Structure formats: C-alpha cells, structure tokens
Regions:
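Alpha-helical transmembrane segments of multi-pass small-molecule/ion transporters
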Residues: 1-303
Length: 303
C-alpha cells in the first residue's frame, strides 16, 4: 500500500474527530453527553466489538498459530511496559501526567485505526492476527488502565469484572477453542460493535473542543512522547522481532504497524471514568493522531 493510500485513511480518522469538535462547539454535545457516551461505549458497544471480532470461529487461525501470535504479543507489551517504566521519569510532570505518559506508551490505537490499516496493508488475513494481538490489549487496558491513569488509590478489584474485561476473556476462549457463534448473533455483535470507531472519534473530538490546542503543540514533553510512541517504539519492536525470529514475517510486520498507531482512544474514556488527567490524555491522543498521518505511511513504506 502506498504512502498516499495510508495517508488517506488517516485523514478520514481526523475528519470524524473534527466532526465531534464541531458538534461540541455548536452545542450538540456537552460534558454530560460526553460522560453518557463514555459509559455507553465501555458498557455495551466496545464489548460487542470485542466479541464480534471472534464471532467467525471457523475462519480464525489454528490454536498453534494463535499461541505463536501471543508470543509476539508478549514481546509487544513487554516492550511497552519497559518503556513506560523509564520514559515518564525522563519526561517528568505531575503524577497524573506521568500516568498519561505510561498509558500512551503501552496502549496504542490497535483496533480503531490498526484494524483498517492492517487490512489495507496486508490483506484480509491480517485481520485475524490483529484480532489476536488486540485481545491482551483489552484485558490489560481495562484492568491496568484505571490504575495507571488514576493511581492505585482509585483502583478497585471490581473493575476486573467490567463488561470489556468479561468480553475479552470470553473472546479469548472462543478464539482458542474455535467456538462457532450463531451467525445471527455474530452479525448483531459486529453491527453494534461497528459503532465504536465513529462514536469514540466523536467523543475525542468533543473532549478536545474545550482544550487549548496551543499546549499540545508547544509542550516539549508531548512532542517527545509522540516521537517515542510513533517512531522509536515501532523501530525497536521491528529490530527485536527480526533479531530473535519470533513470529512469522507477516505477524511481525502487523505487530510493528499496530505499535506505530497513535495513543489509544480508550484512554480518554478511562481518564474521564476514573478521574485521570483528561486534558493531558486528550492532547496526547490529538497530537499523536495528527502526527501519525505522516509517520504511519512512512513506516508502512519501509516494511
């Protein structure tokens, strides 16, 4: 896929965020509707997306292939956690800001942007592997995400029973054992889950509407974070996978592309829900998403 094809995909993402921004400025969306939309996404729509991604159990890779992809996932998240332990100390900032740095380094926008870009680059087969790589994201993001963003005092073990966590565990079992869901159920889950991307992008755009954009562009910390998130981490992952030979070339390339995605949109929803730094998180998402219009096509052209 050419640089300009991937570039076009990224412009679509930004257009939807701009629509959310405009809707907030015109009064169609407010802080209250943002909170309600956040709960709707985390409680119903995102779980449907997670379950729908493995609804066609007979077309997923074999159990052995899934376990092989999970090995790549261990390297993927291991690198993310390693960087999250070091980089925030260099960037500095308040405790909740450092929570944003850590979350941004560990969790990229693997599903909302990663799925369509992976399929566009590597074909429909890539979706199956991307789904498996995203499964640990769902478990880690919705369990550790509140802890990272809001601090240990805000963490409750009941969060492990959130709809997204439960859906992720079920999805992993469905994938490993190739359980076939009824076709109608799969269609319903996929249809409802398909609302995730536009609604999430509208939500982020609405959150950005009340923020001073100058801070995102003038903060050296955010620029350093964006460089690490979008360029350094993907290159480090590519070098490690190539050196160790973990995973097939296709799976390795998919993992690198997913690592090159901007900060996960889920961060805004989780920061709002659990009392994290919503402003800093939204700025991280905005700047990394904006910069990824250039960095993702560049990395894709090099693979």
């Amino acid at each position: 896929m050419s640089f300009f094809d991937v570039f076009s995909e990224m412009l679509v993402i930004l257009f939807c965020m701009a629509a959310g921004f405009l809707a907030h400025k015109l009064g169609y969306l407010s802080k209250q509707t943002d909170q309600n939309l956040c709960r709707l996404l985390l409680g119903i729509i995102v779980p449907c997306l997670i379950l729908g991604s493995v609804s066609a159990g007979d077309t997923l890779p074999s159990t052995g292939e899934i376990l092989s992809v999970l090995k790549v996932a261990i390297v993927y998240y291991g690198l993310g956690f390693f960087s999250a332990a070091l980089e925030p100390r260099l960037l500095g900032g308040m405790a909740k800001q450092q929570g944003v740095w850590r979350y941004s380094l560990i969790f990229s926008n693997m599903a909302f942007i990663g799925y369509p870009v992976s399929v566009a680059l590597f074909g429909q087969e890539a979706l199956f592997y991307a789904v498996i790589l995203v499964l640990p994201f769902n478990l880690l993001s919705y369990s550790l995400g509140p802890l990272i963003l809001a601090g240990q005092a805000k963490f409750r073990w009941q969060q492990l029973l959130s709809p997204c966590i439960v859906a992720s565990v079920i999805a992993l079992m469905v994938a490993l054992f190739h359980i076939n869901m009824p076709a109608l159920l799969g269609e319903c889950l996929n249809f409802t889950g398909s609302l995730t991307t536009p609604l999430s992008l509208l939500l982020v755009g609405s959150l950005l509407a009340d923020l001073p954009f100058g801070r995102a562009f003038t903060s050296p910390r955010l620029w350093a974070l964006a460089a690490f998130r979008l360029l350094i981490l993907p290159i480090m992952l590519w070098l490690f996978l190539k050196w160790t030979g973990i995973g097939t070339p296709l799976v390795a390339n998919i993992a690198v592309i997913l690592m090159a995605m901007p900060t996960a949109l889920n961060g805004s929803m989780l920061a709002m829900e659990y009392g994290g730094d919503t402003e800093c998180m939204a700025q991280s998402i905005f700047l990394t998403t904006l910069m990824s219009i250039i960095t993702i096509p560049v990395l894709a052209a090099l693979l």
